[in-house]
Amino acid sequence: MNFTNIEFYDNIFIRQCQGGVLMKIKTIEQNKQIGALMNEFVKQIIDFYDNLKTQAVCRFPDKGTFEYLEKLPIPNQGRPIRDVYSEMIKCIYSNTLLAQHPRSFSCIPSTASLLSWMGDVMTNAYNPHASCQINAPAADLVEKKLIRWMCNLAGYPKDSGGLFVSGGSIANLTALTAARDKKLTYDERKNAIIYMSDQTHASIAKGLHIIGFCKEQIRIISTDDTFCMDISALRNAIEIDIKNKKKPFAIVASAGTTNTGSVDPLTEISVVCREYNMWFHVDGAFGASVLLSEHYRKNLAGIELSDSLSWDAHKWLLQTYGCSVILIRNQSDLIHSFAAHPEYLKDAETTADSIEYWDLGPELTRPARSLKLWLTLQTVGKNEMGHIIEHGCAMAELTEKIIRENSDWEIVSPAQLGIVNFRYVSNKTMSETDLDIINQNISREVTESGFAQIFTTELKGKKVLRMCTINPETTEKDIYETTEMLNKTKVIYNLSKE
């Protein structure tokens, strides 16, 4: 049967009415319902944060919740919004790791504050399109101001620039794309080699794969006793590749590794890069925030010599996911890789030769990620942010001090930028394999208790317990109680009875 457009929509209207459902996306009545629920939610989330320490760090869903969600279909007809809201609170949001918990010490914990959450809510409500100046001119200006401020902190020159992206993975990928296009011709790509340490974040290799490099083009450089890149090993690897007619083109250094918080010798690496005409990228996703600390920023000496820098605000600058930046020494390198001027965007260009954010990275449609950081910084201030960084470092140093006082434990990697690694070794004669199992079980027992979360990692072939103490709400009491709990786990208690 053929319908005119009017008949088609009339039939839809009739079917909806006959089915007893006439739901539009935007109605005054529904907006009132959403407003009431939002008021309720705000009160609930404030109470949740006020009582965060009473919550279990890890909240595991039961089997019934998974089965319920698995069977839940996408409905043909809409459901009451309060039902969906309550269902999501109960089944989804109540069954997540609380990365923002003061005793969440695994991975790189979230330090997200309610300020950032508020910025998220505001930005998502107004939904600015942050691809170019004409779409959101004030938001565009805020992003430019923040990028300039962060470039200044990194010691970059006036021709530097960058943009906000979703996270460190995309920041690193964006920088490596610029490095490839700056340093290599098309024919040179197949022989190109990039260098990184055995502590480099996995996102680097993944990004290289995405932009056309294979694993055979990556050289993993050994680290020294402090888990920093060995410069002698780096130079040897480069010389071998040159003799084999390869093309060394980039070195990735870490400013705060995920495992240990170690900072590679940035100044020495910059010398190598200049000597061999290579791109110098610093993955500062975690550690770059230390630039705000007057006391610890010296640990990042040499970062100002890099060609590019990734920096996650959602790690140590109180931001919700995802809020990251890629900074580049010469913004024209990003333009060279990403500039696009299709005919359908010409009316959105400020001038014929204007540079918009779609010219600086892989995204066209992009949210205004900078606004929540702007709200946070305007409210908290740079000095307090620096104190937050210093507090996180101090908590790791306290953890190291406590662990060293007990001969049953050994420090494997001392406190660096808020991260410390240690291992239960006991006074008994045990194999390394048995010690690995014991430390894994200690981690599991502490995490399953809900009191704290401590995951393991591996350093020099050993299973170790790792604590990242960067949450500004973490107190000395939290550290003492957590380390006391480690000593009282059933695993250690049972060993003491043998």
Region spans (language model):
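PLP-dependent enzyme catalytic core of the Aspartate aminotransferase-like
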Residues: 459-498
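Conserved PLP-binding catalytic core of the aspartate aminotransferase-like
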Residues: 411-446
